């Protein structure tokens, strides 16, 4: 693994425009459960009922009860991998973080340019009267076990700005992510199985454009053949080592 860490660091140290793409695996190390896999949430819950737009419109309570069961996880803390990515941005290497996660841990770790393909929990909208709220306005109610209700019209159809099954990705964010993939010289995937489309197309776009490719994941993926550097391991252990090696390489110049 040390040899692969060195290779990844060499790519990033030379990069003028690196992009990081993250999935559920990076947040799993902060205690947020993944959705797929042996211990994934979809083995316990029916996503059609608790995480689809049709299910939400049919029964918003089911969505919020699912969220309440995970409420301790919704307030997780960034882990060393999030901080390492933010450090690479501060060093001028990483120009954008593209994430499939909705937990805002990248921002809390210090990353400034984060493209959230699946939205986030920070804003909520009433589907009936279109009133907009900050998540902070409902935290107290949520912690008491009460589901959000529109303060203006009384509707229970108050939905966070997350992409549920059956909804399209935010088109502007997706466009920006595609542009980043086209123009980067290094593309690093962290904690993604690369099975959810269209997001999983981004590494292929970057590869076609000539970017050097790095993946850090807990297990192999079907996309591994397109990567120049493949590291199997925990992001929270691997990324800080990559950052330290990047700093060492830069100090030698």
UniProtKB/Swiss-Prot annotation:
Q: Which residues form the Deacetylase sirtuin-type domain?
A: 1-252
Q: Kindly give the InterPro entries that the UniProt entry links to this protein.
A: DHS-like_NAD/FAD-binding_dom (IPR029035), NAD-dep_sirtuin_deacylases (IPR050134), Sirtuin (IPR003000), Sirtuin_cat_small_dom_sf (IPR026591), Sirtuin_class_III (IPR027546), Sirtuin_class_U (IPR028628), Ssirtuin_cat_dom (IPR026590)
GO MF annotations in UniProt: histone deacetylase activity, NAD-dependent; NAD+ binding; protein-malonyllysine demalonylase activity; protein-succinyllysine desuccinylase activity; zinc ion binding
Q: What Pfam families does this protein map onto? A: SIR2
Free-text comment on the cofactor: Binds 1 zinc ion per subunit.
Q: List the PANTHER family hit by this protein, alphabetically.
A: NAD-DEPENDENT PROTEIN DEACETYLASE (PTHR11085:SF11), NAD-DEPENDENT PROTEIN DEACYLASE SIRTUIN-5, MITOCHONDRIAL-RELATED (PTHR11085)
Protein name (Swiss-Prot/TrEMBL) = NAD-dependent protein deacylase 2
Q: Which organism is it from?
A: Archaeoglobus fulgidus (strain ATCC 49558 / DSM 4304 / JCM 9628 / NBRC 100126 / VC-16)
């Amino acid at each position: 693994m040390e040899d692969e860490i060195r290779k990844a660091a060499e790519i990033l140290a030379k990069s003028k425009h690196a992009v990081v793409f993250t999935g559920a695996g990076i947040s799993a190390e902060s205690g947020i459960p993944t959705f797929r896999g042996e211990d994934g949430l979809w083995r316990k819950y029916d996503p059609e009922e608790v995480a689809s737009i049709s299910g939400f419109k049919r029964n918003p309570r089911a969505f919020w009860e699912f969220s309440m069961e995970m409420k301790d996880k919704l307030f997780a803390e960034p882990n060393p991998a999030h901080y390492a990515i933010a450090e690479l941005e501060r060093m001028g290497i990483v120009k954008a973080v593209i994430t499939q996660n909705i937990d805002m841990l990248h921002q809390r770790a210090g990353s400034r340019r984060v493209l959230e393909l699946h939205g986030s929990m920070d804003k909520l909208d009433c589907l009936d009267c279109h009133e907009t709220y900050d998540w902070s306005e409902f935290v107290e109610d949520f912690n008491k076990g009460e589901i959000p209700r529109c303060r203006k019209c009384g509707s229970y159809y108050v939905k966070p700005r997350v992409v549920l099954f059956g909804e399209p990705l935010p088109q502007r964010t997706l466009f920006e992510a595609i542009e980043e993939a086209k123009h980067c010289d290094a593309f690093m995937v962290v904690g993604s199985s690369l099975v959810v489309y269209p997001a999983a197309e981004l590494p292929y776009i970057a590869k076609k454009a000539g970017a050097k490719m790095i993946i850090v994941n807990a297990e192999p993926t079907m996309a591994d053949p397109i990567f120049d550097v493949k590291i199997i391991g925990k992001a929270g252990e691997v990324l800080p080592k990559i950052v330290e090696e990047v700093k060492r390489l830069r100090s030698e110049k």
